[in-house]
Amino acid sequence: MNILVTGNNGYIGSMLTKLLLDKGYGVTGLDTNYYRGCEFNSFHYPQLKQINKDIRALTKKDLENIDAVIHLAALSNDPLGELDVKLTYEINYEATVKLASLAKESGIRRFIYASSCSMYGIAGKEAVAEDSPLAPVTAYAISKVKSEEALSKMADENFSPVFLRASVAYGIAPMLRCDLVVNNLVGWAYTTGKIRIMSDGTPWRPAIHVEDLGLAYIACLECQIEIVHNQAFNVGQDKENYQIRDMASVVKRVVPGCEVEYTYEHDSDSRTYIVSFDKIATELKGFSPRWDIEKGVWQLYKAYKAHGLTFDEFTGNKYIRLNQLKGLIQKKTVDEKLFWRA
């Protein structure tokens, strides 16, 4: 079985590609490679077929001999999505619909879409399930809602989309990100001795280890198609819902000699949501998470220490997606629409 993984050289994609190849799948990766040279751990998969192309330039020929699609490629978080709202719409929504249409035309039935729990937006204190009202507050979250709606309308006996609404990922992957909350808190603790919280610490977020997230994609790929056909699944565990300040407390227990510091820079951030994961636990039997946040914080701390992560590296372009893209724009390596310049 040959799987097309878009965004395979990103944080989640680099982990998912490894997991798929380790299980014996054929994998074709498609990535525009904005983050080339930003590796945390060197990796090379000789059995991987790589297409170096912008998702917006995809053609039907790129889908030849593909049996299923896992679509990760996107401007990949809320701050990045606000860089250019129109561009976020073009890459995250329009390119997604185009890819799904080409996949359907090519007879590819399984289409697994990387959605996000961020679409719940401001959800209060009650746990939200897949059928709860959506309240996206950022361009990124809106693009996920619109993409789900469009792909759902395309579903029929020949095309079976499924929507994996991911919790906030954490943990070590070959293409590390330090702009995700747990990875970021550990980075501040390790490089400065201060666990820097930019809000008042009260917002809720669900968290999931990047490996567990990859395993969820594989469980979805391997289960009976009738179980996941045109379904949305929140991806995570009930016990992994945390307030930001509770995440910081875990980091404080693990990283020696650090203390919590509140900066209130993002005090206006209204996003908060507790998520129910009953559906994935009961219906996607192949999904069995291996991690929890404390285990993940230990992994991050040990990896940062072994790597010798410096403050400049941690806060620079390499592991912060928005910084890297701004750097490419400033150097005129990419144009204003994020296409590579010739």
Regions found by a protein language model. Name each.
Residues 193, 198-342:
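C-terminal substrate-binding subdomain of Rossmann-fold SDR/epimerase-dehydratase oxidoreductases
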Residues 89, 126, 132, 137-145, ...:
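Short-chain dehydrogenase/reductase
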